[in-house]
Amino acid sequence: MKLIAGLGNPGKKYERTRHNVGFMVVDELSFRHQTPWKKSKFNGMTSEIIVGGEKMILVKPLTFMNASGECIRPLMDYYNIPIEDVVIVYDDLDLPVGKIRLRQKGSAGGHNGMKSIIQHVKTQEFNRIRVGVSRPLKGEVIHYVLGDFPKAEQPDIIAAIQKSADAIEDFAQTPFIEVMNKYNQK
C-alpha cells in the first residue's frame, strides 16, 4: 500500500492556484481511475485507487498548506504505511512551469507544507515530486503562489500534472529510485 499526498489549500478560492498543483495531481489520478473522494477522520479527503494490484491512498489535506503534516502522519500510522511508500506532490518555485523533479530526500526548501510534513514524520528522507510553478518576476511570492496559472502556462502545467500522475502510477510497481531516474531525464 502507498500513500500519495498532494499538497494544497482547501476551498474553491484556491482550487486552480499554483500552490494547489499537488491537489491537481491527485485529482488527476482519482479522475483516471474514476474513484470518489471521501472525508477522512484525519482532516483530509481520501480516494483509493488500485494500480497493477497495488492499493494507493490519495490524500488532499484539509489543514491548509502550513499544517499538512497534521493530516499525513496520522494516515501513515492508521494504515501502517512506511515512509518509503509515501510520495508528497507539491509546487516548487525554483523549477520552471511544467518541469517536474523527483527526489527521495531533501530539505523543505522554504515550502511551509513540506516543513510541516518533515516536522511530523521526523525525517527529510521521503519521496517527493516537485512540480515547477516558477518564481514571480516581481512582487510578493505569496500573491504569486495563490494566483491562478495564466492561459499561456496552462498547457505546460497540464502536461506536468499528467507526467506526475504517470510517475505515481509507475511507482505502484517500480522502486521510486527507478521512477525517479526515468522521469528526471525527460
Swiss-Prot record:
Annotated GO MF terms: peptidyl-tRNA hydrolase activity; tRNA binding
Binding site for tRNA: 14, 64, 66, 112
Site residues by UniProt (Discriminates between blocked and unblocked aminoacyl-tRNA): 9
Active site: 19 (proton acceptor)
GO biological process: protein quality control for misfolded or incompletely synthesized proteins; rescue of stalled ribosome
Entry similarity comment: Belongs to the PTH family.
Official protein name in the record: Peptidyl-tRNA hydrolase
UniProt source species: Listeria monocytogenes serotype 4b (strain CLIP80459)
